[in-house]
């Protein structure tokens, strides 16, 4: 598992909802860890998920949309969308 798997969660949700990146907000907690575990076929802990989420936030690929310092209501940035698109179409 790596940062691209985190970004892919956001992109998949955008496609599922037919929504733009600024309309999709995800929480990187138990539910997201369970979704990634199922998708990747391996156990993903919340701690590992949040560690990679921190890297995505530091790289400005994800952003917090509220004053909540935790992992709720995160949004994909334009830079994050470019990273996932470049990875998919290269």
Predicted regions, residues:
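A short, conserved structural fragment
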Residues: 57-67
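Charge-rich, solvent-exposed alpha-helical interaction surfaces
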Residues: 6-9, 13, 35, 39, ...
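Short, amphipathic alpha-helical interaction segments positioned at domain boundaries
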Residues: 72, 78-90
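Short, surface-exposed loop/turn segments at secondary-structure junctions
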Residues: 22, 67-70
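Short alpha-helical segments that sit at the start of domains
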Residues: 1-22
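Short helix-coil junctions and helix-kink-helix linkers
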Residues: 27-46
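Short amphipathic alpha-helical interaction segments
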Residues: 42-58, 71
């Amino acid at each position: 598992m790596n940062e691209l798997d985190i970004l892919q969660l956001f992109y998949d949700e955008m496609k599922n909802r037919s929504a733009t990146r600024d309309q999709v907000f995800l929480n990187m907690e138990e539910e997201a860890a369970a979704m990634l575990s199922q998708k990747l076929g391996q156990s993903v802990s919340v701690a590992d998920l949040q560690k990679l989420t921190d890297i995505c936030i530091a790289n400005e690929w994800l952003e917090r949309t509220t004053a909540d310092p935790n992992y709720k209501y995160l949004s994909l940035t334009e830079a994050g969308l470019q990273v996932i698109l470049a990875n998919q179409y290269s």
